[in-house]
């Protein structure tokens, strides 16, 4: 029988529910259980694919092409699993499916209501996530906080699950803030008490509390929360602020969180062996050398827009025994006159993905600087496309060269829309999304990075591609297309082999990086940056 764990939040949003859920998932996996995890987002968008990064952070793409919440990146990195489209569910997606069923007559003339139709659809998503992965345990995180009007159907579905599958197969974990008032010199439990009261008013009694706090709460605070919130004292778990998020599973294990969960769900498993994870954390905590990487991006005011990029750089730093000293450079502010001032002290430059005209010329300047000064450079998605544009302008002398996305009237559309995208009008969910194979050129930097594999599978999110009409012209000038689709239609990886490291990929390698298995292209880039350290 599949076991279901539901993680809710109270008091404030962005409290770390996703990290708590991911940490628990890691502990349960290391107990020998097969774990999957999903995120419920109560917003009305179908998915975050068309949302501004300033609103939502990065869009995380799964193997099967779902555009999802950035928390799925935490889930995959912590638990080291590949999730699918059932791992992110929004209000918009549920209502869209319910309304389509109504139009098809599948409700046989019934009045379509939140209960049972919407809640049934939500429960079906929970169960489908478990069955499609054949998991022993599924962890479901509900976005937002208890009390949000948007969350009510989701919480009602969670309440019903207990009756549907039995109390021994369901566990509710509530994450709240435990604020410390300096003026009073004490921690305040009332916000948590009121949050639990609100949750109980919706029919859900939490079995465990996870309290986010800046300093240890002490047993007396835990006992007070246990008494007023009707949970066992040992089931009040502290989530202390830490220097590195990968410490959190170890902190949770030290408080017997996973054992309490297994006892409640009647799961008999050996203790989680976290030796390898602990060794990784010890290494992370004791890195002495730093390598400076300049990230030239459009959305640098909100680092969450590049969350997976940053994590992949960190993972590759672990492999190279260095910490990443990240220098955020706003591409919109980069010019030919100030580029040296902005990135001249960097050991490596990364130009990540993005959409739209703003900042594109600044990214091109950064790529030019890297090429002309032989600074290790990694381009990703739009970064790869602009690498081609920069080469066309400044090496091939194709003045006015650009991407047709950025300048539809360019005389040299080095990057053009994919053929199967031409007649598509909808923006959401219509990009080239998900896992695709890339055939690597023997002897190339890309092939060397991937241990001389002939083919790698990587995740994509783009609508435009390199225009192959220009391929011969590029190759004649020494530009190497070191990764292509198996049918040779799509240019996936480009490089200049005479440089220390000048490689760009159309796909998003960062989406498959893990703390205990860094993505290979990122690792090759960081290695080159370390060798270039000033």
Curated annotation (Swiss-Prot):
UniProt signal peptide: none
Keyword presence, Nucleus: no
Gene Ontology molecular function: ATP binding; CTP synthase activity; glutaminase activity; identical protein binding; metal ion binding
Organism name: Streptococcus agalactiae serotype V (strain ATCC BAA-611 / 2603 V/R)
Active site: 381 (nucleophile), 508, 510
Record-linked PANTHER family: CTP SYNTHASE, CTP SYNTHASE-RELATED
Protein name: CTP synthase
Keywords: ATP-binding, Glutamine amidotransferase, Ligase, Magnesium, Metal-binding, Nucleotide-binding, Pyrimidine biosynthesis
Residues involved in Mg(2+) binding: 71, 141
Gene Ontology BP terms: 'de novo' CTP biosynthetic process; pyrimidine nucleobase biosynthetic process
PROSITE patterns: GATASE_TYPE_1 (PS51273)
Binding annotation for ATP: 14-19, 71
Residue sites binding CTP per the record: 13, 148-150, 188-193, 224
Region (Amidoligase domain): 1-267
InterPro entries assigned to the protein according to its UniProt record, in alphabetical order: Class_I_gatase-like (IPR029062), CTP_synthase (IPR004468), CTP_synthase_N (IPR017456), GATASE (IPR017926), GATase1_CTP_Synthase (IPR033828), P-loop_NTPase (IPR027417)
Activity regulation summary: Allosterically activated by GTP, when glutamine is the substrate; GTP has no effect on the reaction when ammonia is the substrate. The allosteric effector GTP functions by stabilizing the protein conformation that binds the tetrahedral intermediate(s) formed during glutamine hydrolysis. Inhibited by the product CTP, via allosteric rather than competitive inhibition.
Domain Glutamine amidotransferase type-1 span(s) in chain numbering: 292-534
EC numbers, comma separated: 6.3.4.2
Sequence positions that bind UTP: 13, 188-193, 224
CDD domains according to UniProt: CTPS_N, GATase1_CTP_Synthase
Sites where the protein binds L-glutamine: 54, 354, 382-385, 405, 463
Catalytic activity: UTP + L-glutamine + ATP + H2O = CTP + L-glutamate + ADP + phosphate + 2 H(+); L-glutamine + H2O = L-glutamate + NH4(+); UTP + NH4(+) + ATP = CTP + ADP + phosphate + 2 H(+)
């Amino acid at each position: 029988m599949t076991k279901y764990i539901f993680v809710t939040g109270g008091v404030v949003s962005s409290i770390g529910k996703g990290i708590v859920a991911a940490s628990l998932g890691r502990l349960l996996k290391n107990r020998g259980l097969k774990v999957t995890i999903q995120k419920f987002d109560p917003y009305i968008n179908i998915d975050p694919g068309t949302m501004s990064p300033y609103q939502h952070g990065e869009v995380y793409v799964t193997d099967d092409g779902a555009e999802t919440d950035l928390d799925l990146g935490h889930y995959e990195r912590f638990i080291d699993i590949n999730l699918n489209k059932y791992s992110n569910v929004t209000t918009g997606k549920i209502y869209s499916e319910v309304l389509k069923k109504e139009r098809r007559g599948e409700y046989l003339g019934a009045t379509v209501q939140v209960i049972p139709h919407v809640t049934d659809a939500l429960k079906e998503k929970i169960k489908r996530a478990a069955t499609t992965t054949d998991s022993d345990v599924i962890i479901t995180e509900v976005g937002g906080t208890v009390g949000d009007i948007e969350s009510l159907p989701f919480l009602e579905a969670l309440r019903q699950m207990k009756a549907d599958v039995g109390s021994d197969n369901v566990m509710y974990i509530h994450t709240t803030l435990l604020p410390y008032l300096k003026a009073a010199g004490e921690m305040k439990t009332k916000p948590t008490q009121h949050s639990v009261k609100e949750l109980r008013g919706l029919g859900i009694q939490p079995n465990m509390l996870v309290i986010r706090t800046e300093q240890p709460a002490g047993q007396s605070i835990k006992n007070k929360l246990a008494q007023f919130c009707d949970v066992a004292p040992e089931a009040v778990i502290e989530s202390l602020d830490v220097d590195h998020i990968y410490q959190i599973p170890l902190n949770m294990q030290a408080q017997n969180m996973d054992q309490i969960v297994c006892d409640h769900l009647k799961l008999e498993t050996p203790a989680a062996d976290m030796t390898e994870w602990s060794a990784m954390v010890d290494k992370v905590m004791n890195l002495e050398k730093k390598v400076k990487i300049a990230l030239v991006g459009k959305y640098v005011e909100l680092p969450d827009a590049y969350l997976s990029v940053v994590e992949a750089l960190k993972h590759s730093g672990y492999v190279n025994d260095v910490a990443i000293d990240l220098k955020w450079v706003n591409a919109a502010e980069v010019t030919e006159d100030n580029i040296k001032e902005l990135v001249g002290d960097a050991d490596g430059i990364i130009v990540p993905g993005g959409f739209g005209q703003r900042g594109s010329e600044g990214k091109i300047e950064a790529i030019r600087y890297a090429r002309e000064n032989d600074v290790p450079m990694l381009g990703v998605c739009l970064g790869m496309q602009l690498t081609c544009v920069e080469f066309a302008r400044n090496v091939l002398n194709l003045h006015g060269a650009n991407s047709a996305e950025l300048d539809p009237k360019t005389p040299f559309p080095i990057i053009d829309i994919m053929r199967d995208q031409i007649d598509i009008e909808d923006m959401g969910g219509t990009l080239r999304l998900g896992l695709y194979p890339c055939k690597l050129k023997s002897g190339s930097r890309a092939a060397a990075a991937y241990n001389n594999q002939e083919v790698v599978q990587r995740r994509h999110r783009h609508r435009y591609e390199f225009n192959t009409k220009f391929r011969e012209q590029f190759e004649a000038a020494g530009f190497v297309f070191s990764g292509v689709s198996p049918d040779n239609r799509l240019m996936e990886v480009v490089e200049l082999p005479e440089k220390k490291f000048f490689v760009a990929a159309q796909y998003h390698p960062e989406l498959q990086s893990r703390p205990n298995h860094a993505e290979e292209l990122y690792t090759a880039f960081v290695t080159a940056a370390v060798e270039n350290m000033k």
